[in-house]
Amino acid sequence: MFQKQERIGLVVYLYYNRDARKLSKFGDLYYHSKRSRYLIIYINKNDLDTKLEEMRRLKCVKDIRPSAFDDIDRQFVGNLHRDETNNHQKGYQPPSY
């Protein structure tokens, strides 16, 4: 049966756009911004450490930043109610216009 792989997105900044093909072997190349010279690559989470080490060794890579998608609260239902109760507990008064 098919098992879902845990994946993570990496934003890889390059010195030159011509080096984008070299990085396509590390994972799934999702987006390439030629103007800003960065790539978005998705890789498996269990391979993250080894692939980051290999990518950082390349001379064409300026910087690598992992995605913060896992850190974001994606529970949108009830956010307004939760914020409203927190503001009332702190004594927050909305501005009067």
UniProtKB/Swiss-Prot annotation:
Its main location: cytoplasm. Belongs to the UPF0298 family. NCBIfam families: PRK02302.1. The keyword Electron transport does not apply. This is UPF0298 protein MGAS10750_Spy0325. It holds the Pfam family DUF2129. It is found in: Cytoplasm. The keyword Cytoplasm applies. Disulfide bonds: none annotated. GO terms for cellular component: cytoplasm. Keywords: Cytoplasm.
